[in-house]
Curated annotation (Swiss-Prot):
Substrate binds at R21, Q22, A23, G24, R25, F40, D71, Y147, S202, H316. It is found in: Cytoplasm. NCBIfam families: hemE. Homodimer. GO terms for molecular function: uroporphyrinogen decarboxylase activity. Keywords: Cytoplasm, Decarboxylase, Lyase, Porphyrin biosynthesis. It is an enzyme of class 4 (lyase). PANTHER family: METHYLTETRAHYDROFOLATE:HOMOCYSTEINE METHYLTRANSFERASE RELATED (PTHR21091), UROPORPHYRINOGEN DECARBOXYLASE (PTHR21091:SF169). One of its GO terms (biological process) is protoporphyrinogen IX biosynthetic process from glutamate. This is Uroporphyrinogen decarboxylase.
Length: 340
C-alpha cells in the first residue's frame, strides 16, 4: 500500500494523497446515501451505509486511502451521554459532565458497544482494493472532553477552561476515562481491519502552551504509545489543529504529524520533518479555484520535495460546496507533479 509505505518513510512512486472529510456533502452520492439512512447518526450506526459512503470518494476521486466514515462523538455517546445532531446547529449532548457527581454518568467499556463501527470496518476492508489503505480514527481526549463539558461545540470553551484552571483534578479524571475508552476503541478498530489510525485534536488551539501539553498532548501521546506497543506495524497519525507555535516541544512515539492549513509547511518540516512523516496541508478553500489550487500544490511540493516523508492532504476538512471536479483534479495533479 503506497499510503502505508509513505507513513513508514519507504520509497513510493509518487506522494500519496487522501483528504480529510473526503466522504461528505460535496458528493451527491453521499447526500443520496445519507437521505436513505435517515439522519447523520443513523448513517454512522448503519454498517452497510457507512461502508458505502467510505468507499464513494475512493471510487470517485481515486485517493490512496479510505477513512472510516463515523464521528468522533460516538465514543462519549457510548459512554452514556445522549447525542443528537441538529440541522444548522451541529451535535449536542443532552447531559454534561461538569461535577464529580456527573462523572457517575460515564460508563466503562464504551469500546465494547461500538460493534456497528467494527462491522463497517469489516465490510469496507472486504470491498476496498488491496492497494488502498483504510484509516481508523478517534478524537483526542481533550477535544472529546470539551464536547462532554460544554454539551456542544463552543467558541469560548468557557466551562472547559473554568474546570481546567479551577478544578484540574476533575478534568484529568474525565480525560483519563476518555483515554481508556479510546485505547480500547482504536485497538478494536485495528483488530477489525484498519491499516492506520489517526487522532484528531480539533480544539488544540483553544489551549495556551503552558497547559496544552499537560491536558491534551500527554494524553494523545499516551494513546499513541499504547497503539505502537501493541501494533508496531500500524502507523499512528496525530493531528493537533492550530499549534504552530508549539512545534518545538512536540515529541512522542507516533509516525505521522498532521499539519493544518494555518501552519507553514516549511516551519513544520524544519521542526519535525527529520522525525515524523508530515501530512498536509493544502488550504481547502483553494479547491474553489483551479489555478489557486495548483498554486498551493506547487508550493507544498516545492517544500516537501519528491523524497519520502510526506502524505498530501488538506489542512482541514473538505467544505460542503467545493466542486467535486476540482477534488478529482487535485488527486491527478498531486500524482503527476510528485511522480518520482
Amino acid at each position: 500500500m503506497i499510503f502505508i509505505d509513505a507513513c513508514k518513510r519507504q520509497p513510493t512512486p509518487y506522494t500519496p494523497i487522501w483528504m480529510m472529510r473526503q466522504a461528505g456533502r460535496y458528493l451527491t452520492e453521499y447526500m443520496q446515501t445519507r437521505e436513505r439512512a435517515g439522519s447523520f447518526l443513523d448513517l454512522c450506526k448503519n454498517p452497510e451505509l457507512a461502508c458505502e459512503v467510505t468507499l464513494q470518494p475512493v471510487e470517485i476521486l481515486d485517493v490512496d486511502a479510505a477513512i472510516l466514515f463515523s464521528d468522533i462523538l460516538v465514543v462519549p455517546m457510548e459512554m452514556g451521554l445522549e447525542l443528537g445532531f441538529y440541522q444548522g446547529e451541529g451535535p449536542r449532548f443532552s447531559q454534561t459532565i461538569r461535577t464529580q457527581k456527573d462523572l457517575l454518568l460515564l460508563q466503562e467499556g464504551a469500546e465494547n458497544r461500538l460493534g456497528y463501527v467494527y462491522e463497517a470496518i469489516h465490510r469496507i476492508r472486504e470491498s476496498l482494493h488491496q492497494e488502498k489503505a483504510l484509516i481508523g480514527f478517534c478524537g483526542s481526549p481533550w477535544t472529546l472532553a470539551t464536547y462532554m463539558i460544554e454539551g456542544e461545540g463552543s467558541k469560548t470553551y468557557a466551562h472547559s477552561k473554568k474546570m481546567l484552571y479551577s478544578d484540574p483534578k476533575l478534568l484529568h479524571a474525565i480525560l483519563a476515562q476518555v483515554s481508556e475508552a479510546l485505547k480500547g476503541y482504536l485497538a478494536k478498530q485495528i483488530e477489525a481491519g484498519v491499516n492506520a489510525v489517526m487522532v484528531f485534536d480539533s480544539w488544540a488551539a483553544a489551549l495556551e502552551e503552558s497547559v496544552y501539553f499537560e491536558f491534551s498532548w500527554e494524553y494523545m501521546k499516551e494513546i499513541a504509545s499504547f497503539v505502537k506497543a501493541r501494533y508496531p506495524h500500524i502507523p499512528v497519525m496525530l493531528f493537533p489543529k492550530g499549534i504552530a507555535g508549539f512545534l518545538d516541544k512536540i515529541e512522542g512515539d507516533f509516525d505521522v504529524f498532521g499539519v493544518d492549513w494555518s501552519t507553514p509547511m516549511d516551519l513544520a518540516k524544519a521542526k519535525l520533518g527529520d522525525r515524523y512523516v508530515l501530512q498536509g496541508n493544502l488550504e481547502p478553500a483553494r479547491l474553489y479555484d483551479r489555478a489557486k489550487m495548483e498554486e498551493g500544490v506547487d508550493h507544498i511540493l516545492s517544500i516537501m520535495g519528491k523524497e519520502s516523508g510526506h502524505v498530501f492532504n488538506l489542512g482541514h476538512g473538505m467544505m460542503p460546496d467545493l466542486p467535486r471536479e476540482n477534488a478529482i483534479e487535485l488527486v491527478k495533479m498531486v500524482r503527476q507533479k510528485s511522480a518520482r
